[in-house]
From Swiss-Prot:
Function text: Inhibitor of the alkaline protease.
Entry-linked InterPro entries: Inh (IPR022815), Inh/Omp19 (IPR021140), Protease_inh_b-brl_dom (IPR016085)
Cellular compartments per GO CC: periplasmic space
Protein name: Alkaline proteinase inhibitor
Family assignment from sequence similarity: Belongs to the protease inhibitor I38 family.
Signal peptide region: 1-26
Disulphides: 53-70
Natural source organism: Pseudomonas syringae pv. tomato (strain ATCC BAA-871 / DC3000)
Record-linked Gene3D superfamilies: 2.40.128.10
Top-rank taxon: Bacteria
Keywords associated with the record: Disulfide bond, Metalloenzyme inhibitor, Metalloprotease inhibitor, Periplasm, Protease inhibitor, Signal
Protein's cellular compartments: Periplasm
Amino acid sequence: MNINYFVRIVPVAVVLLVGISGASMAMSLKLPNPAELSGQWRLSLQGKADDACELQLNTEAPQLTGDVACAAKWLHEPPAGWFPTPDGLALTDNQGNRLIHLNRMDEQTYEARLPGGELLILGRFAD
């Protein structure tokens, strides 16, 4: 085989592989509809459920209600809004800036590691 053949075919193969893997990753992460996540949630540190904050995720303004002052002790300011992401959800300040991103663990649980190492858990209220 000619070396020119390899020089031409390798870049094409790399582009195809990168495109395929990127497309499959994009298909595996679905952006949830905000209505799927709206409702009552509890925010707490792992192992400290008695110190939990009750939050209400709404699809209309005000987007986030409940005990936002309680949540501020971990977020350093009260959250005012939220939005879904393909791999979780984000809590935002009143300007729409992201305060924290919580990773989706399952349909009822989202988690984030705080700078001090504590695990912050957002869990859906059981009806």
